[in-house]
Design a protein with these regions (language model features):
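A general structural motif
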Residues: 2-4, 28, 85-89, 112
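C-terminal, charge/polar-rich interaction regions
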Residues: 175-255
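Long, hydrophobic/aromatic-enriched structural stretches that serve as scaffold segments
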Residues: 61-104
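Short, conserved secondary-structure transition motifs
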Residues: 119-137
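A short acidic (Asp/Glu
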Residues: 16-21, 43-44, 99-107, 127-131
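Short, surface-exposed basic-aromatic patches at helix termini and helix-loop junctions that form
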Residues: 23-26, 84, 104-114
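A conserved mid-domain beta-alpha-beta active-site/ligand-binding segment of alpha/beta enzyme cores
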Residues: 132-210
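A structured, charge-rich N-terminal accessory region that forms the first stable segment of a protein
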Residues: 1-68
Length: 255
């Protein structure tokens, strides 16, 4: 009988990458994604409805409609209550980003003896054109890379002390008191950051009269090695604006 295999990634975008690659490779395995980025949002202390709602609400109430909140909450509840023991193998795809690693730690809690992980970091040296650092995240992977670098062959079973360590890491980070958790592309180690850690950079570039897109691009370049997404930067810009710490009436570019 054919094995029942599930692949898990940390974002909808990465799910699309795997689905496209698998289509070309004739693979029909199921692929799911974690609907909340725990590197920059509240990590639930348990999987109760109240805690899961806190995670969803932390995404930013001004960025979500009521429909969005209900949809994400439903997806998150499904994610943490799925019977993963019904699969022969559960593959977690990850790189060195905090979001990827936190997914791996979470899946160590949710699975039994069927968890495997595919660490794409070993392919980093082949993807220098996309990322100059030792660690990469799933965002560096395109569909062709999955076949070219035989990434499925990188799968390793998570067991024993390794799984215990990952569970310990999840318990550690869910107790984090700071809002951001990012890992360095140079070390692959997660550290926590305060809410205002990039405020000075945002305000500095905003004062140059940059339009919003250019402002986000400059801030992104400053923190690229922490795998920070533009959505995180936009969220903080909006928070600063609401707190009257940032003037978003930026000037029109000069021709």
């Amino acid at each position: 009988m054919k094995e029942k295999i599930l692949h898990v990634v940390s974002s909808a975008c990465y799910r699309g990458t795997l689905k496209q690659a698998f289509y070309g490779m004739g693979i029909e395995d199921e692929v799911i994604y974690l609907p909340v980025d725990f590197s920059c949002n509240y990590i639930p202390k348990d999987f109760s409805d109240a805690e899961l709602m806190l995670a969803v609400m932390s995404i930013g109430t001004d960025l979500l409609t009521l429909h969005d909140k209900e949809k994400i909450l439903s997806e998150l509840k499904t994610f943490v209550t799925t019977d993963y023991s019904s699969y022969d193998k559960v593959y977690v795809w990850h790189g060195g980003s905090a979001n990827d690693l936190l997914l791996l730690y979470l899946m160590s809690i949710l699975t039994d003896d069927n968890l495997y992980h595919i660490d794409i970091t070993s392919c980093a040296k082949f993807m220098k054109k996309q990322n100059p650092w030792p660690y990469v995240d799933m965002g560096c992977v395109c569909p062709d890379d999955i076949k070219t670098f035989s990434m499925l062959s990188l799968a390793k079973k998570v067991m024993g002390t390794e799984k215990t360590e990952y569970i310990g890491q999840w318990n550690r980070w869910k107790a984090s008191t700071k809002p951001y958790r990012f890992s360095s592309a140079e070390t692959g180690i997660i550290e926590e950051y305060p809410a205002d850690f990039m405020d000075d950079t945002i305000i500095k570039y905003a004062k140059e009269g940059r339009v919003l897109g250019a402002l986000m691009a400059k801030v992104f370049q400053e923190y690229y090695n922490l795998f920070i997404s533009t959505s995180i930067i936009l969220k903080r810009i909006r928070e600063l604006y609401r707190e009257h710490k940032l003037d978003l009436t930026v000037s029109i570019r000069k021709k």
